[in-house]
């Protein structure tokens, strides 16, 4: 082979090797692209149903211990356009209560980072339900939890997290600086109401979708306060009740109509000899019903019902099945305040069904322990103490606390009625237990017209914690 032939042969071999290498590289790129398409296709494959849920794990390490802080559900393929929650539906017919959520916050907080809280409540939009709560600016099992039995301080804030999750710095959203609060969704945005400041001049700050839209100054300079549960929205307007004045005597009560975070109308109730605090409100057939706490002289609960023009009616639940705590043993009720054991009280709720009423109450008549749901078929208007259904929620040997109502609108559930729900606060720590702190977890239930069961769903944390020893 002469030199020219050698050069041609070597060049041909190099060219063939180069072409083969190029083909292999192109094949590698195609393989990677196909593999990536298959993986992302599996994660985002559209289903035949209306929505798919993609779950992302949010994990952390605490003191070398692996803690699963939360599972965040991202709704995919669902129309997230705004709707107006009309509130025109009636309450769904129900036969009992199915457990909806339990956050186990105190149990998890013995090792994980969980907020010291009280006054939790739940509110739902047309897309999700969230737990709102008042933090103490501290974590469980930490030195700053000391003295958190105090109700009002500059460190308290309203925050929220997905319902059923323990409230932690990793899954919670700041809402407002507040030691008294309310929140609700009108279908277009979240309204939050946070009250903070000194007892003799507190101010309520209203936010709509996180932006300050209005403020309300204390008008009696005596601990302006609000619901500690969700406000109620009807046809784009949201409604709340505020109290200012003595906790053990005649105070002043106002209904406020709020649109996109701005107060558009308010009235002061003409309610002599009535006492309204910490009302639990819900929409029903275009009106709003609120069942409240009488901390002055009633062991039964006062109520106020009003329309969108704030024309209102007032009364007390007549049933001899009393709903407050402390309270006397069940007996003869009254459509006015029942004075026996009427001083002091606890936040609570009831749901009216024509002349009947579902009453939520502690099992104990004197301490904040146990919880049960009672159906009194004529208790809204009659004073006897007979009832037909009792469903156990928390045993009398376990601590309970505040309770309140919330609803799930048809725009969320797909039902043609308003689903009634309630939450129960499970208080732990001071003043009843040997700790340096006060906090709570929560459970919630929703009304169903199918099988349910009575049981006890207590907080379940073993106290004291290491910080208490």
From Swiss-Prot:
GO molecular function term, any single one: metal ion binding
Ranges for region Head of neuraminidase: 91-469
CDD domains: Influenza_NA
Protein activity control: Inhibited by the neuraminidase inhibitors zanamivir (Relenza) and oseltamivir (Tamiflu). These drugs interfere with the release of progeny virus from infected cells and are effective against all influenza strains. Resistance to neuraminidase inhibitors is quite rare.
Region annotation (Involved in apical transport and lipid raft association) ranges: 11-33
GO CC, alphabetical: host cell plasma membrane; membrane; virion membrane
Glycosylated residues (UniProt): 50, 58, 63, 68, 88, 146, 235
Binding-site positions, Ca(2+): 294, 298, 324, 344
Subcellular location: Virion membrane; Host apical cell membrane
Membrane-spanning segments: 7-27
Modification note: N-glycosylated.
Active site: 151 (proton donor/acceptor), 402 (nucleophile)
UniProt topological domain (Virion surface) ranges: 28-469
Membrane topology designation: Single-pass type II membrane protein
Alphabetized UniProt keyword annotations: Calcium, Disulfide bond, Glycoprotein, Glycosidase, Host cell membrane, Host membrane, Hydrolase, Membrane, Metal-binding, Signal-anchor, Transmembrane, Transmembrane helix, Virion
Stretch list, region Hypervariable stalk region: 36-90
Cofactor binding, per record: Binds 1 Ca(2+) ion per subunit.
Catalytic reaction annotation: Hydrolysis of alpha-(2->3)-, alpha-(2->6)-, alpha-(2->8)- glycosidic linkages of terminal sialic acid residues in oligosaccharides, glycoproteins, glycolipids, colominic acid and synthetic substrates
GO biological process, any: viral budding from plasma membrane
Gene3D superfamilies referenced in this protein's UniProt entry, alphabetically: 2.120.10.10
Positions of substrate binding: 118, 152, 277-278, 293, 368
Intravirion side: 1-6
Enzyme class: hydrolase
Binding partners and assembly: Homotetramer.
Domain description: Intact N-terminus is essential for virion morphogenesis. Possesses two apical sorting signals, one in the ectodomain, which is likely to be a glycan, and the other in the transmembrane domain. The transmembrane domain also plays a role in lipid raft association.
Protein name: Neuraminidase
Source species of the chain: Influenza A virus (strain A/Brevig Mission/1/1918 H1N1) (Influenza A virus (strain A/South Carolina/1/1918 H1N1))
Gene: NA
């Amino acid at each position: 082979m002469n030199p020219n032939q050698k050069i041609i042969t070597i060049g041909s071999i190099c060219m063939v090797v180069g072409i083969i290498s190029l083909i292999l590289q192109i094949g590698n790129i195609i393989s990677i692209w196909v593999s990536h398409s298959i993986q992302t296709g599996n994660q985002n494959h559209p289903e035949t149903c209306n929505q798919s849920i993609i779950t992302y794990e949010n994990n952390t390490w605490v003191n070398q211990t692996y803690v699963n802080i939360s599972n965040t559900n991202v709704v995919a393929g669902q129309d997230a356009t705004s709707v107006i929650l009309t509130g025109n539906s009636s309450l769904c017919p129900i036969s009992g209560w199915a457990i909806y959520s339990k956050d186990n916050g105190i149990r998890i907080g013995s090792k994980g980072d969980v907020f010291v809280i009280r006054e939790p409540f739940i509110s739902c939009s047309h897309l999700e339900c969230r737990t709102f709560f008042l933090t103490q600016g501290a974590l469980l099992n930490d030195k700053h939890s000391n003295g958190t039995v105090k109700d009002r301080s500059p460190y308290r804030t309203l925050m929220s997290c997905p319902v059923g999750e323990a409230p932690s710095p990793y899954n919670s959203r700041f809402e407002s600086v507040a030691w008294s609060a309310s929140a609700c969704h009108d279908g277009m945005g979240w309204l939050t109401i946070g009250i903070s400041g000194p007892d003799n001049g507190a101010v309520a700050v209203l936010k709509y979708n996180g932006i300050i839209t209005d403020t309300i100054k204390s008008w009696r300079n005596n601990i302006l306060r609000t619901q500690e549960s969700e406000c109620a929205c009807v046809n784009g307007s949201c409604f709340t009740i505020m109290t200012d004045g003595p906790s053990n005597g005649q105070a002043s009560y106002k209904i406020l109509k709020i649109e996109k975070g701005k107060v558009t109308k308010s009235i002061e109730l003409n309610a002599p000899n009535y006492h309204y605090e910490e009302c639990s409100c819900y929409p029903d057939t275009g009106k709003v019903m609120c069942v409240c706490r009488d901390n002055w002289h009633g062991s039964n609960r006062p109520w106020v019902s009003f329309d969108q023009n704030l024309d209102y009616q007032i009364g007390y639940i007549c049933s001899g099945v009393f709903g407050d705590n402390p309270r006397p043993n069940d007996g003869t009720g009254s459509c006015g305040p029942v004075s026996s054991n009427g001083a002091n009280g606890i936040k609570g709720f009831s749901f009216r069904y024509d002349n009947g009423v579902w009453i939520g109450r502690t099992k104990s008549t004197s301490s904040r322990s146990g919880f049960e749901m009672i159906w009194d078929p004529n208790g809204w208007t009659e004073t006897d103490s007979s009832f037909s259904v009792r469903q156990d929620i928390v045993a009398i040997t376990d601590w309970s606390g505040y309770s309140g109502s919330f609803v799930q609108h048809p725009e969320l559930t797909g039902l043609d009625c308003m689903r009634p729900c309630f939450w129960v606060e499970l208080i732990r720590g001071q003043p009843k237990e040997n700790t340096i702190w006060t906090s709570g977890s929560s459970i919630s239930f929703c009304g169903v017209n199918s099988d349910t069961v009575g049981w006890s769903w207590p907080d379940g944390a073993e106290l004291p914690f290491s910080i208490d020893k």
